[in-house]
Amino acid sequence: MPTIQLDGAGVRVALPGRGEREILSVTDLVLTERRIGIVGANGSGKSTLARLLNGLVRPTSGRVLVDGLDVARRGAAVRRLVGFCFTDPAAQLVMPTCVEDVELSLRRSIRDAATRRARAMEVLAGHGLADHAHDSVHSLSGGQRQLLALAGVLAIEPTIVVADEPTTLLDRANTRRVTDTLFALEQQLVLVTHDLEAAARCDRVLVVDGGRVVADRSGVEAIAHYVGLVDR
């Protein structure tokens, strides 16, 4: 598995007229497990932590390394290694049709249009979306849109997939479908979630509270800690 390292990484933001606010306290972590969960309340800093891993957010202190690559200095190279799946697939689906959206992900790696189209169709088929290749992305169900967004991420063959609350907008059936798809991946998975059943499937779970990692344990142990925080 790849190695993700946070070496004194923290995030502060400037607030006009109010100085700075700490979003994520200085954090030291080495993540090598195949399935890593991140849980915490809304606004706890868990999404900030996840976004550090592919450079969507840059640390204001310390550094983040992915297989030895500094995210702040080697952002383009890191983003080829780390695919990111957002909560709302609308943040990722920008082309008119499904096949065009996957082709967009492949535009740098496959220059020939016919070859790119063929590969995009293979990717869609792998996610049960081949019959929707020429459909508008807006005609898909919520679960299908999230699977399409994930397909676009996986098309570039990353070694790590970071999924930031990918099932928050989905019903139970689609939540199960997307979650099972994520856990079937060969890639290392970092899953930010409110779904404690999904978190329990992870090898390691980080609990984030008030901008700090307050627990770093196995899935069941970390969830028990988190539930204790919520029930205080």
Question: What annotation goes with each model-predicted range?
Answer:
Residues 212-232:
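Conserved beta-strand-loop-alpha-helix hinge in the C-terminal portion
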Residues 62-73, 78:
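Conserved ABC transporter NBD signature motif
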Residues 161-165:
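Catalytic Walker B motif of ABC-type/P-loop ATPase nucleotide-binding domains
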Residues 54:
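Helix-to-loop junction immediately C-terminal to a conserved catalytic motif
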Residues 1-6, 10-26, 74-75:
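A short, flexible loop at the N-terminus of ABC-type nucleotide-binding domains that lies
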Residues 136-140, 144:
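Conserved ABC ATPase signature
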